């Protein structure tokens, strides 16, 4: 059961805010209406935690040769950040054939802030409790207004083979 949050217009809750209620994180992924007759907005539960890392190339010496024992490694950008996850695969159907759902593409919604601003295409995304890795293929930063700096960062990532 979703908790009911009672707020006023003075609380300054915006799209992209994270709320922590009764042991669970919620992301305000919809626009919050500021008119007195339009108080309702939806808080989506963050059921997953994500980690985002970036591949760092090996170090080289002044001649351009790789220094020993500094192979390619992952540099963590975000660790255990609450997120909303959906699978955004495609349906493939034709006459007399069953549709196939390809679940190798995920869509992750995160709070837009100075940590998530660092995410780029090609970064590696992992889900807590899931051994697979996903590569960020696109991202969209939306819902910025004149009153706020946050917003929602929507990432599409493809499962790595």
Q: What is the role of each PLM region?
A:
Residues 1-154, 158-161:
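Short, conserved turn/kink motifs that form compact alpha/beta structural patches or helix kinks used as
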């Amino acid at each position: 059961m979703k908790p009911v949050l009672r707020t006023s217009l003075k609380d300054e809750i915006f799209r992209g805010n994270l709320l922590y209620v009764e042991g669970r994180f919620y992301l305000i992924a919809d626009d919050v209406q500021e008119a007195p007759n339009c108080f309702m907005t939806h808080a989506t539960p963050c059921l997953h935690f994500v980690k985002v890392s970036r591949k760092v190339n090996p170090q080289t010496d002044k001649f351009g040769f790789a220094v020993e024992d500094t192979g390619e490694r992952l540099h963590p950008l975000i660790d255990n950040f609450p997120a909303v996850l959906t699978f955004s695969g495609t349906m493939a159907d034709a006459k007399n054939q069953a549709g196939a759902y390809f679940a190798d593409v995920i869509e992750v919604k995160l709070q837009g802030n100075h940590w998530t601003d660092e995410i780029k295409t090609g970064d590696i995304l992992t889900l807590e409790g899931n051994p697979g890795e996903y590569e960020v293929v696109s991202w969209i930063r939306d819902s910025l207004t004149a009153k706020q700096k946050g917003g929602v960062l929507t990432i599409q990532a493809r499962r790595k083979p």
